[in-house]
């Protein structure tokens, strides 16, 4: 259970960081990476 939760949170953080990078590059420029 704990192992599954760890993988789920890791995948969520990874997906979120990728989304933020894409948003920063293609967005309105308010978030700059």
From Swiss-Prot:
GO terms for cellular component: cytochrome b6f complex; plasma membrane-derived thylakoid membrane. Its main location: membrane. The keyword Transport applies. GO terms for biological process: cytochrome complex assembly; photosynthesis. Signal peptide: none annotated. The chain crosses the membrane at residues 2-22. It is found in: Cellular thylakoid membrane. It is a single-pass membrane protein. GO terms for molecular function: electron transporter, transferring electrons within cytochrome b6/f complex of photosystem II activity. Keywords: Electron transport, Membrane, Photosynthesis, Thylakoid, Transmembrane, Transmembrane helix, Transport. Disulfide bonds: none annotated. It comes from the Bacteria. Pfam families: PetN. The 4 large subunits of the cytochrome b6-f complex are cytochrome b6, subunit IV (17 kDa polypeptide, PetD), cytochrome f and the Rieske protein, while the 4 small subunits are PetG, PetL, PetM and PetN. The complex functions as a dimer. Belongs to the PetN family. Component of the cytochrome b6-f complex, which mediates electron transfer between photosystem II (PSII) and photosystem I (PSI), cyclic electron flow around PSI, and state transitions. This is Cytochrome b6-f complex subunit 8. It comes from Prochlorococcus marinus (strain MIT 9211).
């Amino acid at each position: 259970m704990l192992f599954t939760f760890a993988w789920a949170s890791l995948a969520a953080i990874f997906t979120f960081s990728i989304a933020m990078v894409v948003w920063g590059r293609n967005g309105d420029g308010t978030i700059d990476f």
